UniProtKB/Swiss-Prot annotation:
The keyword Magnesium applies. It catalyses: adenosine(37) in tRNA + dimethylallyl diphosphate = N(6)-dimethylallyladenosine(37) in tRNA + diphosphate. Residues 40-43, 164-168 are annotated as: Interaction with substrate tRNA. The record marks T106, R128 as: Interaction with substrate tRNA. InterPro entries: Dimethylallyltransferase (IPR039657), IPT (IPR018022), P-loop_NTPase (IPR027417). ATP binds at G15, P16, T17, A18, S19, G20, K21, S22. Substrate binds at T17, A18, S19, G20, K21, S22. This is tRNA dimethylallyltransferase. Monomer. GO terms for biological process: tRNA modification. Its cofactor is Mg(2+). Keywords: ATP-binding, Magnesium, Nucleotide-binding, Transferase, tRNA processing. Catalyzes the transfer of a dimethylallyl group onto the adenine at position 37 in tRNAs that read codons beginning with uridine, leading to the formation of N6-(dimethylallyl)adenosine (i(6)A).
Length: 297
C-alpha cells in the first residue's frame, strides 16, 4: 500500500452525479491508506440513502467513510457547518495516518475547503427557525419587502420568489446589523491547502453519463427508494427544507399520491438528474482551473 501523506495533504475528487467518482475515491483510499470524506450536500442527511446514492456497505469495501448520513433530515446544515465538521474530523485522520479523500458533487464545499468561500457569521438557531417559519406562513414576497427596508441593495439583486436566499440575507442583517454583502467579500479559512492536494474532476462523455444516470434511477426504483420518500414525507418537513429538494423526492411523492406512474417517475427523475448533471458539468468546467486533473471514467 502506497501512502501519499508525505507528499500531499489530501485528495479532492469531484464531478457530476453518476460519474463514478465515489468508486474512484474508494480505490484511491485503499491504495494510499486513506479515509473517504463526503463532500455532497444531500448525502449528509440521515434519510434517502438510496435516493441520494449514498455508498452502501458493500461499495465502501471496508474503507472508513465520514460525514455521511450524520445530519437529521429537518436540520439546518450549511456549507459552513460542513466545513466545521471537516475541521473537527481532520486531526483524528491525521493522527491515524489516514489520507483524507474528499469526494462529492457540491462545488461550494470544495471552494470552502480550500478557502475560496466567504467567511459567513454564525446565526442563532432561534432566529433561523423564526425566519423559516415566517417564510412558510407569510411567503417570500413579504420577507423580500422586509429585506428591502434594511438592506435595499441586496434585496434589489434577489429574485422575490427565492425564499432561501431572502431568508439568508435577512438572518445575517438581523444577527449582525451588517449586509450579507459585507461578508461575501471576505475569504474564509483555508482548511486544505489546494497547492498540496491532488485534485481530480471526473468529466465523463455525455452519452456515457446519461446511460449511467438512467441505470442509476432504475436501480433506485428496484431498491424501493419510494419507501424512503414515504418515510421522509411522514416527517412533515417544510417544502423549503433542503432535503425535500433532493432529485426524485417530488417525482416519487407524486407516484405515492397516484399522480404519476412508475414509468413516469423513471422518465422524469432521470431527466431531472440529467439536467442537474449538465449544470454541474458547466460549473466544474468554469470553476476548476488547470491544476485539477481531468479524468474520463
Amino acid at each position: 500500500m502506497e501512502n501519499l501523506l508525505s507528499t500531499v495533504n489530501a485528495i479532492l475528487i469531484t464531478g457530476p452525479t453518476a460519474s463514478g467518482k465515489s468508486a474512484l475515491a474508494v480505490e484511491l483510499a485503499k491504495r494510499h491508506g486513506g479515509a473517504v470524506v463526503n463532500a455532497d450536500s444531500m448525502q449528509v442527511y440521515d434519510t434517502l440513502r438510496v435516493l441520494t446514492a449514498r455508498p452502501s456497505e458493500v461499495e465502501m469495501q471496508g474503507v472508513p467513510h465520514h460525514l455521511y448520513g450524520h445530519v437529521p433530515a429537518g436540520a439546518a446544515y450549511s456549507t459552513g457547518a460542513w466545513l466545521r465538521d471537516v475541521s473537527a474530523l481532520l486531526p483524528a485522520l491525521r493522527a491515524a495516518g489516514q489520507l483524507p479523500v474528499f469526494v462529492g458533487g457540491t462545488g461550494l464545499y470544495f471552494k470552502a475547503l480550500t478557502g475560496g468561500l466567504s467567511d459567513m457569521p454564525d446565526i442563532p438557531e432561534a432566529l433561523r427557525e423564526e425566519l423559516r417559519g415566517r417564510l412558510l406562513m407569510e411567503g417570500p414576497d413579504r420577507l423580500h419587502a422586509e429585506l428591502a427596508e434594511v438592506d435595499p441593495a441586496m434585496a434589489a439583486g434577489l429574485n422575490r420568489q427565492d425564499g432561501q436566499r431572502i431568508v439568508r440575507a435577512l438572518e445575517v442583517v438581523k444577527a449582525t446589523g451588517r449586509s450579507i454583502a459585507d461578508f461575501q467579500g471576505q475569504s474564509g479559512p483555508v482548511v486544505i491547502d489546494a497547492a498540496q492536494a491532488r485534485k481530480i474532476v471526473v468529466l465523463p462523455e455525455r452519452a456515457v453519463l446519461h446511460a449511467r444516470i438512467n441505470g442509476r434511477f432504475e436501480k433506485m426504483l428496484r431498491e424501493r427508494a419510494e419507501d424512503e420518500v414515504r418515510a421522509l414525507l411522514a416527517l412533515g418537513l417544510p417544502a423549503e427544507a433542503p432535503v425535500m429538494k433532493a432529485i426524485g423526492v417530488s417525482q416519487m411523492a407524486a407516484m405515492l399520491s397516484g399522480e404519476m406512474t412508475r414509468d413516469d417517475v423513471l422518465e422524469k427523475g432521470a431527466a431531472a438528474t440529467r439536467q442537474y448533471a449538465k449544470r454541474q458539468m458547466t460549473w466544474f468546467r468554469n470553476q476548476m482551473d488547470e491544476s485539477w486533473e481531468r479524468l474520463t471514467l
